[in-house]
Amino acid sequence: MFNVVLVEPEIPQNTGNISRTCAATHSVLHLIRPLGFEISDRTLKRAGLDYWQYLDVRYYDSFDELYEKYKDVANFYFLSTKGAKRYSDVNFKDGDFLVFGKETHGLPEPLLEKHYENTLRIPMWENLRSLNLSNSVALTLYEALRQNDFAGLNPKGHLTGRKD
């Protein structure tokens, strides 16, 4: 199971989409306060639809609170346009933490500097500032899952009425 960390997310629709992705992949969602919305926000829950009952979401008052709790048991990877390595060049392991910053500013530079060897980026055209947060989470999380043979996820689909 992977861990997705959102540091001070601002847009409820993004967090709702990420919540749905985490529920669908059986990943834990860690939210670092302050949040730019109320958890009861209908746009947040609408984006997550009926998946909330399957979501494991945990709240923290600071990134340091989360990091101190898990730093000795898992790897932390910090996603940023300023990352040292491409996200696809890392060998992700079950239990790893994928850390994403707020939509308008990303992760704080001191945090990136402190963990520079574990900063990752998603390659993109240099004329654009960044990708959408929920797309970045999905892309990175599914790469981590792919590398681990999608462990724990449904291995095949089923067409209605098909007998094989």
Where are these regions (language model features)?
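Post-transcriptional modification and biogenesis factors for structured RNAs
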Residues: M1-D164
